[in-house]
Curated annotation (Swiss-Prot):
It holds the Pfam family Mito_carr. This is Mitochondrial glycine transporter. Solcar repeats lie at residues 23-108, 128-218, 237-325. Belongs to the mitochondrial carrier (TC 2.A.29) family. SLC25A38 subfamily. The lineage of its organism: Eukaryota, Fungi, Dikarya, Ascomycota, Saccharomycotina.
């Protein structure tokens, strides 16, 4: 009877959970920001081309732009990284905040439930119900989206060929004074297209977390066979599962929210100097009136599809691997020692 009691106690989930303490908040911030920075720099060309495809199109068919036409307009390969500075600032800060707040929210819910089955075998992040994943992703994205909206406007205009900003300061100044001849600006200009952006990003983030956890914990763990990690170097089973889940989740979520991305870009590129104040409804009507009709709501989808898939695969994989490793914690410890 003694052996029967002692044997299962060595394999209970509680012991595994105790061996994997939850990372500190600053660890999530550093890991998320690092993942966002790498993703933004490597995938900036996708963002630039997508923005230019979604610019206002002329009715004459010969003026309608394509990816090949936009590539031919570039004089140097570095032009593909125009707007990289505001993009990296937005993505690194946004990703750091998003992962940190999301982790805190998910840990809070997990602690409240006090479930013994709250940890995945491929991740040390908490395991929640589908609705909880959807809700936390949705709400956290709304908070971070509002915080990073001003830099998002600068990024979008930087990437277009409508506004030829030479510096971020010029971009902020131009947006602040947009359409006002008397030199009196408005902070409201930095939140232009906020509703369309949140209508795209919040459902996307909610669905992304939902599908990511679904693919990671319920599908891919049954599909991806165990591998000998000693022979595959840095490539582990969890890396394959996390990356694949991120790409699949991003692909599904991107397709569903594509129309709001096109509307958001049109709103953020509009200027009250050129026309009357554009609204969500007027931007949608303008897009559908142009050659292509409803298809215009999905312009740039292939680029966003590729970028979001790769971005999610890169950022979530790097984030999860950094969280599981002691990389961020080592940085924090070293900085603390220097301060002492």
């Amino acid at each position: 009877m003694v052996s029967d009691v002692s044997e299962p106690s060595d394999t209970t989930p509680e012991v595994v959970v105790q061996q994997q303490p939850q990372p500190k908040t600053l660890t999530h911030l550093i890991s998320g920001a690092s993942a966002g920075l790498i993703s933004a720099i490597s995938l900036q060309p996708f963002d630039l081309l997508k923005t230019r495809l979604q610019q206002q199109q002329r009715s004459n068919i010969k003026y309608r732009t394509t990816i090949s036409k936009e590539l031919k307009k570039l004089t140097h390969i570095r032009d593909l990284w125009r707007g990289a500075l505001p993009s990296t600032l937005r993505t690194s800060v946004g990703a750091g905040l998003y992962f940190t707040i999301l982790s805190s929210a998910r840990n809070g819910i997990s602690d409240y439930k006090r479930s013994s089955d709250s940890v995945s075998d491929t991740s040390i992040l908490p395991k929640l119900s589908p609705f909880e994943n959807l809700a936390t992703g949705f709400i956290v994205r709304a908070v971070v989206g509002i915080i990073t909206m001003p830099i998002t406007i600068v990024k979008t205009r930087y990437e277009s060929n409508i506004y030829n900003y030479n510096s971020m300061y010029e971009g902020f100044e131009n947006i602040y004074l947009d359409g006002n001849q008397k030199g009196q600006g408005s902070l409201k200009n930095f939140f232009k297209g906020s509703f369309a952006t949140l209508a795209r990003d919040c459902p996307y983030a909610g669905m992304y977390v939902l599908f990511y956890e679904l693919f990671k914990n319920d599908i891919l763990t049954k599909v991806v066979p165990p591998i000998d990690e000693t022979e595959n170097g840095p490539i582990t089973r969890s890396t394959i599962i996390n990356t694949s889940a991120a790409i699949l989740a991003a692909s599904v979520s991107t397709t569903i929210t594509a129309p709001f991305d096109a509307i958001k870009t049109r709103l953020q590129l509009s200027s009250i100097v050129a026309s009357k104040k554009m609204t969500l409804w007027s931007a949608t009507k303008d897009l559908m009136r142009e050659d292509g009709g409803v298809k215009n709501l999905f312009r740039g989808l292939s680029l966003r599809f590729g970028r979001k898939g790769l971005s999610s695969g890169i950022s979530w994989c790097i984030y999860e691997e950094l969280i599981k490793s002691n990389f961020a914690q080592v940085i924090i410890t070293k900085s603390d020692k220097k301060l002492v």
